[in-house]
């Protein structure tokens, strides 16, 4: 019996919608990363993108435990000398709430071209509206 390997052109991808209201950031991100990679499927193949599309709503209502709301700090660099910038979780939620979930999930995906392809299947929205109704996403309860 030969080992099964999924072919990129035969992979069936579903669309799911997830409500992030009250969900813990890390626990939500691990489940999203698992589904974006396709590890929940029987035909999972490490070198093929077998994951599903995921729409995350209400990113501004995601929860963190402990004092992380004020203590967790996100860093980025502008590219200029002395250009390191920082923002707390509260500031990130106020400015761009989608980035909090995107950063958490991106860190859990593989690095390289395959990981970037998986990350592109994640659609995060701060509010309760999305423009993917034509794909008929199923509700995913996490």
Swiss-Prot record:
Query: What Gene Ontology terms describe what this protein does at the molecular function level?
Result: mRNA binding; structural constituent of ribosome
NADP among keywords = no
Gene Ontology terms, cellular component aspect? cytosolic large ribosomal subunit
Question: Sorted alphabetically, which InterPro entries does this protein's record hold?
Answer: Ribosomal_uL13, Ribosomal_uL13_bac-type, Ribosomal_uL13_CS, Ribosomal_uL13_sf
Q: Does the keyword Protein biosynthesis apply?
A: no
Quote the HAMAP family the UniProt record gives. Answer: Ribosomal_uL13 (MF_01366)
Q: How does it assemble?
A: Part of the 50S ribosomal subunit.
From the Swiss-Prot or TrEMBL record, give the protein name.
Large ribosomal subunit protein uL13
This chain's source organism reads Citrobacter koseri (strain ATCC BAA-895 / CDC 4225-83 / SGSC4696)
